Swiss-Prot record:
Pfam families: Rhomboid. This is Rhomboid-type serine protease 2. It is found in: Golgi apparatus membrane; Golgi apparatus, cis-Golgi network membrane. The keyword Transport does not apply. The active site is at residues 134, 187. Disulfide bonds: none annotated. Its main location: Golgi. Probable rhomboid-type serine protease that catalyzes intramembrane proteolysis. The gene is RBD2. It comes from the Eukaryota. Belongs to the peptidase S54 family. The chain crosses the membrane at residues 20-40, 67-87, 99-119, 126-146, 155-179, 185-206.
């Protein structure tokens, strides 16, 4: 019975991994590759890519985008991957590969990173560097908590009604208390931009949809890229698969079933 259960779990895990959309796959592979590359001692990859407030300048602005991909050690990377992968997969499935790329290597990363640097330097007068994808995790959690709040405003513990939108805030405090060395400020900056995006203001941050559609059609991305998710959320690229659970949308088209609402974050 036990070997059969193990085989079943292995098959489910393999099936899940083979269905991951393109951007999520690339993020997972990049984190794994950079974690392996960080093991060598010839070049300090962590020092190069960390978000260090006093190191941010025009020539080092790449740090605003590289820090989520680099981790302190293998365990740090594994824990963040376990938390990030399902959240990123749901986001990309709903909003498309190009939109995910534009947002996560754009405003959803750079805005909280700049906020962290400014608060560290101007308010705390400190220079604590941060690494890891946990800021992305809390950004995505905050976005989902807002969507959940719209349909289920409270959850109950004992006789206390707790707003569902506070879930990522509670989790960030628990993580800060239980795991030494974590950046509460970094997580709070990620949560803040997640709340903004969750309320629908990401359309002010994302590139215009007509531009993304033009790129998608011009480069014929649906045909040439495996597991690419179209902006219209109904079509995957070659070798990709459709979402396992669909329901009719308002116009009769299929829409991916996600936790909470299916409201777009794009324009």
């Amino acid at each position: 019975m036990r070997p059969r259960l193990q085989n079943f779990n292995a098959l489910r895990a393999r099936s899940y991994l083979t269905r991951l959309p393109l951007f999520t796959r690339l993020i997972v592979l990049a984190i794994i590759a950079l974690s392996i590359a960080s093991l060598q001692s010839v070049w300090n990859l962590r020092e190069w890519g960390a978000l260090i407030p006093e190191e941010i300048s025009i020539t080092n602005a790449y740090r605003l985008s590289t820090f989520p991909l680099i981790h302190l050690n293998v365990i740090h990377a594994i824990l963040n991957l376990l938390a990030l992968t399902p959240l990123m997969e749901r986001f990309e499935t709903e909003h498309g590969t190009l939109t995910s790329l534009a947002l996560f290597f754009g405003p959803l990363t750079s805005i909280p990173a700049v906020a962290y640097v400014l608060i560290e330097r101007c308010i705390f007068r400190a220079n604590h560097g941060v690494l890891g994808a946990s800021m992305w995790v809390f950004t995505l959690l905050a976005m989902e908590s807002i969507q959940t709040y719209k349909s289920n405003p409270h959850f109950v513990i004992g006789s206390v009604n707790i707003p569902t939108w506070t879930t990522p805030l509670i989790m960030s405090l628990v993580v800060a208390a239980l795991i030494p060395g974590t950046s509460l400020l970094g997580h709070l900056c990620g949560i803040a931009i997640g709340y903004v995006a969750g309320f629908g203001y990401a359309k002010l941050l994302a590139p215009p949809e007509w531009g993304l559609r033009w790129v998608e059609n011009r480069l014929n991305l649906l045909k040439i890229l495996p597991h690419y998710v179209s902006i219209d959320k109904t079509t995957y690229g070659r070798f990709g698969v459709l979402p396992t659970t669909n329901r009719p949308g308002p116009s009769g088209s299929a829409a991916t079933e996600l936790v909470g609402t299916t409201q777009r974050l794009g324009p």
